[in-house]
């Protein structure tokens, strides 16, 4: 695992560390589902951004998005091994493009819409960028080689 260097001393503005939300994926460990965020994203927020990472569980409508976002200073829309479900951008789902994470989709798309409308800074990586595109009405190519 490559190390993420921390910010140089004195390069972060004074005051409390920013709270940065990281949406979680749901993955099964045997029969039990777990909410997970990749270590590289957690470390990047903590070290490179000198922030405090806050996992956002994929609980869909159980999360009050405006309330959550009023407490966060930004969002990092993380990458994931899963793909955005093709139903969300007008395509057909296939086993070839699995896995999908419908709970994450149902959480992140409203999260993005609320963050954008409330002016909360958002940084998107890989799957997160695909979610941003779909949340704004865009489409995706399920496989670039097609």
Language-model regions, residue ranges each:
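N-terminal beta1-alpha1 cap of cysteine-dependent amidohydrolase-like domains
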Residues: 1-123, 133-141, 145-146
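Conserved G/P- and acidic residue-centered "switch" motifs that form tight phosphate/ATP-binding loops
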Residues: 126
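The feature captures the ABC ATPase H-loop/switch
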Residues: 129
């Amino acid at each position: 695992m490559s190390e993420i260097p921390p910010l140089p001393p004195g390069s972060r503005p004074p005051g409390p560390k920013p709270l940065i939300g990281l949406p979680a994926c749901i993955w099964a460990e045997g029969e039990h589902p777990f909410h997970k965020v990749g270590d590289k994203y957690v470390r990047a927020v903590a070290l490179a951004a000198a922030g405090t990472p806050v996992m956002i569980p994929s609980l869909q409508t159980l999360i009050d998005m405006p309330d959550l976002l009023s407490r966060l200073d930004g969002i990092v829309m993380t990458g994931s091994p899963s793909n955005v479900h093709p139903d969300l951008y007008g395509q057909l789902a296939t086993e070839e493009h699995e896995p999908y994470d419908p709970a994450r989709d149902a959480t992140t798309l409203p999260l993005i819409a609320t963050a954008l409308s409330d002016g909360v800074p958002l940084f998107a990586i890989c799957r997160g960028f695909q979610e941003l595109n779909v949340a704004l009405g865009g489409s995706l190519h399920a496989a670039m080689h097609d």
